[in-house]
Amino acid sequence: MSKLLKPKREVGIIGYGAYVPMYRIKAEEIGRVWGVSSFPIQEKSVPGLDEDTITIGIEAARNALKRAQIDPKLIRAIWLGTESKPYAVKPSGTVIAEAIGATPDLDAADFEFACKAGTEAIQAAIGFVGSGMADYAMAIGADTSQGRPGDHLEFTAAAGGAAYILAPKSSETLAYFEASYSYVTDTPDFWRRQHEHYPRHGNRFTGEPAYFHQIINAAKTLMEELGYTPNDFDYAVFHQPNVKFPLTAAKILGFPKEKVLPGLLSGIIGNTYSGATLVGVSAVLDIAKPGDRILWVSFGSGAGSDAFSLVVQDAIEEKRDLAPKTMDYVNRKKYIDYALYAKHRGKYIL
């Protein structure tokens, strides 16, 4: 029996959009405060005082709608994957749905699975559309992640997200899913208990038994079941908590770094958690050619990975310029110091 996940009707992406806040803090500025001189990234994004996961999701959703060119009322589900929702009890997806004019005839929910909550929403949307229950569903991955002051996570925990509108594969879809595969184990590498402000992690335990075990198994299984090798893919996007991990995963799997670098943004915007691979794939779609095949592999602590094989279609050529591109947001930046960063992130407890 095949391990692949395939819907009864083929599903594609009819619209996508990303958003990254414009504020940045350099890793060396964080290091200056804490006396650290080696850094996992160059700089990271910081949300503005009036930005949160919902506003990031709204901006990304609006960009996705611009490319999809459909009436938002046709969207029958909006699912937001995040681990930093503004409300403990109140859905964020409903706010996004209202803001883009999609209410009231739709389903909305918030998904959680650490950093792979966004691709959990993608998997659900593929099933929803692929089953014929709906013709359009939106999946969003967005976060405004936090790191304890002085902890090495503080150097990478960032903000950003992306939205994807899924539809039955047609000449209007700009890419389609060949198949997907999910792999999960009970691996307590990273967690945050209720009422705690910052997450805790298992240091080195987050690497080999968590990130690499899930990523490698998910990617290998998907490729083996499809009969593909790294040579069959033009791009590969892996979850990117830093720069080192995805490049190491690529090397283990046999992908040259040239296929990874176009979607590897963590070095210049940080780890956007649930948005990480969704933003990375959006950057690849901004430059990909029809016929290109993309390997997309997420990771979420706790732990698990979703792997997708995505094939770019002709419609990408006419649709990608209908909304701001991912690098437009990456290159739009305003640097702040640690004091302003602490203010923006609510690190002052009065």
UniProtKB/Swiss-Prot annotation:
Enzyme class: transferase
Catalytic activity: acetoacetyl-CoA + acetyl-CoA + H2O = (3S)-3-hydroxy-3-methylglutaryl-CoA + CoA + H(+)
Keyword Coiled coil appears in the UniProt entry: no
EC number: 2.3.3.10
Gene3D superfamilies: 3.40.47.10
InterPro entries referenced in this protein's UniProt entry, alphabetically: ACP_syn_III_C, HMG_CoA_Synthase, Thiolase-like
Pfam families referenced in this protein's UniProt entry, alphabetically: ACP_syn_III_C
Record pathway: Metabolic intermediate biosynthesis; (R)-mevalonate biosynthesis; (R)-mevalonate from acetyl-CoA: step 2/3
Record key words, sorted: Acyltransferase, Isoprene biosynthesis, Transferase
Residues engaged in binding (3S)-3-hydroxy-3-methylglutaryl-CoA: 115, 156, 206, 239, 271, 301
GO terms, molecular function: acetyl-CoA C-acetyltransferase activity; hydroxymethylglutaryl-CoA synthase activity
Job of this protein: Catalyzes the condensation of acetyl-CoA with acetoacetyl-CoA to form 3-hydroxy-3-methylglutaryl-CoA (HMG-CoA). Functions in the mevalonate (MVA) pathway leading to isopentenyl diphosphate (IPP), a key precursor for the biosynthesis of isoprenoid compounds that are building blocks of archaeal membrane lipids.
Subunit structure: Interacts with acetoacetyl-CoA thiolase that catalyzes the precedent step in the pathway and with a DUF35 protein. The acetoacetyl-CoA thiolase/HMG-CoA synthase complex channels the intermediate via a fused CoA-binding site, which allows for efficient coupling of the endergonic thiolase reaction with the exergonic HMGCS reaction.
Protein name per UniProt: Hydroxymethylglutaryl-CoA synthase
Organism: Thermococcus kodakarensis (strain ATCC BAA-918 / JCM 12380 / KOD1) (Pyrococcus kodakaraensis (strain KOD1))
